[in-house]
Amino acid sequence: MCIRDSIESGADVTAAYTKQPIPEGVRSSYEKTNYLHYTFSMAGQKISKIFVNSEENGVQNVSMNIYVMERQLLIDEIKKGFVLGNKFFERDVLAPQTEKLNIQGYEFTGYQARIDDMKSYFDENMKLLKDENLDSLFSGNPIYTKVRDDNPTRYINGSKAKNVMVADGCVIEGEIENSILFRGVKVAKGAKVKNCILMQDTVIEAGAEIEYVVSDKYVTVSEGKQLKGTDSFPVFIAKDQVV
């Protein structure tokens, strides 16, 4: 839709944006990561001004950092930017040229998420446990990913599962609730998993209890261990760690 609108409008550049308040995590991310966020002032569909790291409250036209433009124009701007020592496309190339270039806005109204820290990663993933968000994000278009042929997930007698998204190759003997499990996760008998995101080949051993945990690949939570974060501060376990 954005590409079609860009062609039909004759714009030099079309920028996708959403109407929403600036997310709190985005406001504070610059001090930690030098990440810049952008908002637009609109005159009809034309972007008349681009603001960098705006502190305005209320609903804004927030950039999605998605732009459609002709290949040759992009090449020309990159060459000029290289000579001038520019570093940021939006700040150094587009923002100074809102009068020179025809920069049009495209409002995106579907599901979108801005992930810039562990908290937002956890929150946005957990939202996918709601059918309306999942259906909006995966709306029939194919998803291309790495192929790993595996067995269907097995739920052993006595296991319990409630409101979960589980990939193939998992073995569930314990209890899982409000959680997302990547491929090959194993939850042993007597283990309890709640409000967690467990990445590929994580192993939760017998009797372990975890809550509000994000585990990277190949993590093992040892037998009988308890590990609990909170919804505002999920615990992260790095790749290959044994807890």
Task: Give residue spans per PLM region.
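Unchanged
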Residues: M1-N125, I237
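Left-handed beta-helix
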Residues: Q72, K80-V243
